[in-house]
């Protein structure tokens, strides 16, 4: 469990996550990182019935043209992504955060839905969640940006309160755009041997501790 922290105090946030599990972002699908790859890490923990995520991302050029929530943020510029699946079922969530303060929320009923989407058998619009199911804040720092995101127990169908012993699969990823029109640099905390963020067999199984 994380120590108490003030969500508006980035120094206190960093201190609370000091002893939390930290997951580095990488490019496991590539023998060597791309020249434009920039590092980052993600810390995770829980407190007050909320699963908390802190990301610290190096970035040479923050950019996004996002203007509203639930746009295809990964096509519009820099984005940080959370993939979360409580172990009680097959449902999982794909949550995006853009440096502009916009979000994308998708609820997948099962692991095969991504294949049905890519084959045109289902529509992304049917997966959108309009009401906020997580909170987040971002800040720009010299050489990058930071994200604090909180997913309440209710999003996972868990009772509020003590989350110790709860288990979920988790993966965190990003699209890092350079602003020069080139393709974004992708990275993930998961050891994806194939570049597919939805490969749940590569995600990290987390057990939340007291």
Regions found by a protein language model. Name each.
Residues 1-210:
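Structural preference for beta-rich elements and adjacent junctions enriched in aromatics
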């Amino acid at each position: 469990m994380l120590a108490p922290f003030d969500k508006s105090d980035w120094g206190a946030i960093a201190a609370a996550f000091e002893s939390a599990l930290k997951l580095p972002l990488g490019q496991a699908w590539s023998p060597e990182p791309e020249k434009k790859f920039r590092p980052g890490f993600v810390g995770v923990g829980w407190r007050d019935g909320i699963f908390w995520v802190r990301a610290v991302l190096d970035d040479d050029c923050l950019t996004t043209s996002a203007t509203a929530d639930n746009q295809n943020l990964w096509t519009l510029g820099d984005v940080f992504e959370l993939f979360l699946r409580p172990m009680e079922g097959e449902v999982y969530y794909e949550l995006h955060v853009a440096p502009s303060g916009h979000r994308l929320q998708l609820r997948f009923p099962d692991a095969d839905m991504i294949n049905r989407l890519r084959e045109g058998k289902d529509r992304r619009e049917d997966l959108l969640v309009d009401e906020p199911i997580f909170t987040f804040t971002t800040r720009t720092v010299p050489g990058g940006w930071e994200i604090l995101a909180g997913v309440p127990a209710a999003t996972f169908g868990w009772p509020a309160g003590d989350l110790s012993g709860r288990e979920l699969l988790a993966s965190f990823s990003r699209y890092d755009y350079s602003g020069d029109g080139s393709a974004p640099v992708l990275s993930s905390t998961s050891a994806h041997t194939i570049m597919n963020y939805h490969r749940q067999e590569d995600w990290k199984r987390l057990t939340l501790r007291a």
